[in-house]
Structure formats: C-alpha cells, structure tokens
Amino acid sequence: GFNAVTSVSEEWALNYSKESHPDRKTRYQIADEFLDVVTGLWENRELRFDPDGIRRFYADPINHQGKNYQVLGPLNVAPSPQGRPLIAQAGGSGPGIKVAAKHAE
C-alpha cells in the first residue's frame, strides 16, 4: 500500500527541499496534486499482447503541468499484478478528509 502523509514537523519538510513547513491547507493542496500525478502515472501503463502474441509494456505521457509538479511521464516501470498500490490517507482535518475522499481506498 501507499500511505499519503503530509508530514507533521518542520524537520520532515526540510527533507523535501522546503525552506519551511507549509500550513495544513497548503500541505493538502500539494498532496492532492501529488496524488493526481502519481495515480496518473500508475494508471497510464499496461502490459498487453500485440497481434503477434508478444506481451509488451505500454505507457503514455501524462503531461501534468501543475502548481507544484511538472511531470511529462510516462512512468517507465511495468505495473505490478494489482496495477497500483492501495492508497491510504488518515488525515482528520477538513482538507485531509477531502483528499482522502478523492484519492484513498
């Protein structure tokens, strides 16, 4: 699974090239965009059989241009048997619940 955590401390934020810890609303806006990107990458690839019977990997660019991320894609890793990991998000604030409702299983 994939646990989408927006971090709780200044020290953790510094691990991701941030000069300071964003406020809660901003963290969840960033998380929402990140989850859009990563699920787009996960869901935009497949293994399928060509007409010649050979199983091949296919993936298309996602061309994401957002406020926080610019990702052309595609993800260059074949999908796992389940396609993508289960997404968990345990935020209890209003913004956290909104992100969980949109992205988490």
Where are these regions (language model features)?
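Internal, glycine-rich beta/alpha segment that forms the wall or movable "lid"
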Residues: F2-H103
